[in-house]
Each structure stands twice: as structure tokens, then as C-alpha cells.
Swiss-Prot record:
The keyword Cytoplasm does not apply. The chain crosses the membrane at residues 29-49, 84-104, 114-134, 167-187, 217-237, 275-295. It comes from the Bacteria. SUPFAM superfamilies: MetI-like (SSF161098). Keywords: Cell membrane, Membrane, Transmembrane, Transmembrane helix, Transport. Its main location: membrane. This is Probable ABC transporter permease protein YesP. The gene is yesP. Gene3D superfamilies: MetI-like. It is found in: Cell membrane. It is a multi-pass membrane protein. It comes from Bacillus subtilis (strain 168).
Length: 309
């Protein structure tokens, strides 16, 4: 009995040491998660029910921030309208262009690695301040786009940033340019499609277009779904291009006033931290609901290969 008891104690000590080692290894993540995610989110939730300007103590006002947001702030609804337009137009265009380039690269005989790297670069630098400034100059009154239009015979300069509609579309085009990450994922999916499927369809008389829509596209639907969710979330968080192109104002006539930009204005231009926190939580709910809808509707169009196959 004594020997068994000693063995049990040794085993218990060994387990405790293993547990301590495990906790030590994951402690940096836990500390970082608490300090940079949980605590800031909790503070933001509290501040959303207060009036807070960074210089005085937060004052509890209940739901007043949310009431003002939904009933008395026309700019808020404009920012929602601009953001949803940006997402609904930009995400499908970006995914469509990414899939188009991926199909071309998948069929390329040589140089795939080089082109893959070149096409991915915009995703790395596309959201940077430097690229946004470059984009603003390209579409400026004396920029490259107007110079090309003059070269083909269009003498009238287009004031891209003086019109709310065209200004927003320049932002959308900039977002489409950042297609590289989705393209790489699509390309990986295309490489994994069994060639036997396409060969069998070809033997049955299916042409290239039919093979794409009847075989390739259905097999890619899980990847399309993944890219759709990720790009939708990313689009709702877009800030830098709108800030640089509109010089932080969201103009003209609030035509480029994305939600994140308006949140920034409320927080750091007007120091309404409580209101900005409320906006952040509303956006979290909106993105969460849209993501939930995408997951719920995915069963109607996303096709997964069964485990038996």
C-alpha cells in the first residue's frame, strides 16, 4: 500500500508539472487575449452607455447614444448606406476578378509562380497609406486616368472626387485591386479538383464553359463561401482608403463616408468616445447577423463532397 501511495504521489506531481508547463506556454496568449481583446471590449461596451470625451469621467446616460444614432443622426444612416453600397458592389467584384485570374493562372503552362506572386502583391500593399495616396493622384483632375481619356479623344476632365457616386466607385475599384489573397485560395482549390472529373465531362461532350459551370464552380463553392465571409467582414472594416482619398472628411457630400470613417470622426474629431463605442457595437451586431445569414443560407448553394465519396 505504501509503495502504491508513493507511486500515486509521484504521478500526481508529474501531472501537476506537466500542467504548469502547459499553462506557462499558453500564458502569453491568455494574457494578450485578456489585455488586448476581452478588457478593451468590456470597456467599450461600458462606454457605449456613457457620455465620455477622454478628458472627463464617463457619465452614465443609458441608451441615449443608441437613440441618437437611430433617430437623430442623418450622417449615421448615410454612413450605413455608403458602407453597404461599398460591400455589396466591392465584394462580388473582388471575388469575381480573383476567380477569373485564378482560372487563367491554373491553365497557364509556364510562369505561374511568378504571376501568382505579382498578383498577390496588391493584397499586401493595397490597404497602405502610400497606395491610397497613389490612387488619389491617379484619379485626380490631372491624373493618369484623365490623361488616358484625353489621349482617346475625351477632352472634358472627369472630376472623380467631386461627384459622390464616382468618388465611391474609385474606392470600390481600389478594393477590387486587392484580390490577391482570394485569388491564391481559389487557385489552390482549382489545383485540387480531380482531373478525372473534367476529363469525364469532356468525353461526354461538355465544352469548356459547361465544364466550368457544371463541375468546377460547384466544387469550388466551399472556397467561394469562405472567401465571401472573409471579404465581407474585411470590407465592413475598410478605413484607410476612404480616409486618405477624402482627406478624412468622407466627402464630397458624404459620398465616401464609410462607417469606420464616421466612427473615427466621432471618436477623434469630436471626442465622443461613448457614441463611437456604441457605433462599434452596432457594427459588430450587423456583421455578426450578416455572417449568420451567410452560414444559414450556405446549405442552399454550397456543395461539400460526402465523406463516403
Amino acid at each position: 500500500m505504501t509503495g502504491n501511495g508513493a507511486d500515486a504521489m509521484k504521478k500526481s506531481r508529474s501531472i501537476r508539472k506537466d500542467n504548469l508547463a502547459g499553462y506557462a506556454f499558453i500564458s502569453p496568449f491568455i494574457i494578450g487575449f485578456l489585455c488586448f481583446t476581452v478588457i478593451p471590449m468590456g470597456a467599450s461596451l461600458f462606454l457605449s452607455f456613457t457620455s465620455y470625451d477622454l478628458f472627463t469621467a464617463p457619465k452614465w446616460i443609458g441608451l441615449d447614444n443608441f437613440k441618437e444614432m437611430f433617430t437623430g443622426d442623418e450622417k449615421y444612416w448615410q454612413s450605413l448606406k455608403v458602407t453597404f453600397t461599398y460591400v455589396l458592389a466591392g465584394v462580388p467584384l473582388r471575388l469575381g476578378f480573383a476567380l477569373f485570374i485564378a482560372v487563367i493562372l491554373n491553365n497557364a503552362a509556364k510562369g505561374t509562380a511568378i504571376y501568382r506572386t505579382l498578383f498577390y502583391l496588391p493584397s499586401i500593399i493595397g490597404g497602405s497609406v502610400a497606395v491610397a495616396i497613389m490612387w488619389r493622384n491617379i484619379f485626380g483632375n490631372d491624373g493618369v486616368i484623365n490623361a488616358l481619356l484625353f489621349f482617346v479623344g475625351i477632352d472634358q476632365k472627369i472630376l472623380w472626387y467631386q461627384n459622390p457616386t464616382s468618388a465611391l466607385w474609385t474606392l470600390i475599384l481600389l478594393s477590387v485591386w486587392q484580390f490577391g489573397s482570394s485569388m491564391l485560395i481559389f487557385l489552390a482549390g482549382l489545383k485540387n479538383i480531380p482531373s478525372s472529373y473534367l476529363e469525364a465531362a469532356s468525353v461526354d461532350g461538355a465544352n469548356r464553359v459547361q465544364r466550368f459551370f457544371k463541375i468546377t464552380l460547384p466544387i469550388l463553392t466551399p472556397i467561394i463561401f469562405f472567401n465571401l465571409v472573409m471579404q465581407t467582414i474585411s470590407a465592413f472594416m475598410t478605413f484607410t482608403p476612404a480616409y486618405i482619398i477624402s482627406k478624412g472628411e468622407g466627402g464630397p457630400l458624404d459620398g465616401t463616408l464609410l462607417y469606420s470613417l464616421y466612427l473615427f470622426q466621432r471618436a477623434f474629431n469630436y471626442f465622443q468616445m461613448g457614441y463611437a463605442s456604441a457605433m462599434a457595437w452596432v457594427m459588430l451586431v450587423i456583421v455578426g447577423l450578416i455572417t449568420l445569414i451567410l452560414f444559414k443560407t450556405s446549405s442552399y448553394w454550397v456543395h461539400y463532397e460526402s465523406k463516403e465519396e
